Amino acid sequence: GHCIRCQPCLAVCPRGAVSIMGAAASDCTPLAGNIPEPRQLDTLFKGRRSVRHYKRENVSPGLLQELLDSAAYAPTGSNAQNLLVSVVDDIAAMDALREAVYLRLDELAETGAMPDCQRRAFFLSAGKLWKAGGWDGIFRSAPHCVIVANAKNATCVEQDPLIYLSYFELMAQARGIGTLWCGLLYWCLRDVLPDFLPRLGIPDTHQLGYAMLFGYPSINYRRTVETRSALVRHIGWN
């Protein structure tokens, strides 16, 4: 076989004698004593909530970088590591993007040029509602968003961005940052405004994966909720 840069040799060596690709055991975090308790991790999973109300405040650059650094450890198919992560990390830029999206949606609706797409009825009205009263149905007044794309020739082109955002979200919520999986922004960019993608740093070589809003929440959840379990089938093979 050939090396795909996943570094299990570095991670497994009991004496820390392996160095590879410029990394040594001294650069790494020991696992013993540093893994969270299962109950704590379970509470984080259960306490994760979608946030649709945000403070108008930039997330500090240092904290944002910590979230991005943690999410970089999300697995990718064949360890390809070809993700492209676009972050709108300033409220002023987010406001400009928000305004541009709604103005274009309103223009498409007014001229009858709205493409036939998923959530078309929503997009037909979104620009008008924004102009009339500032209703922000797509961005939920979030101060930031992160948009993840993957190389079109990646082994797991659709799966990798979703795994990345799952890592990003859990670390964000562990640090008091609210998040929202934003399907409306994803569908808008994919189906209605694909010409926005280059300005968001996504070239033709990459496929849009998904989008997530984030920022300091203006509400605080106090407890977990009760949810219905997934349908589980235990399979025997005789």
Which functions belong to the PLM regions below?
Residues 1-238:
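Acidic, surface-exposed loops and disordered segments
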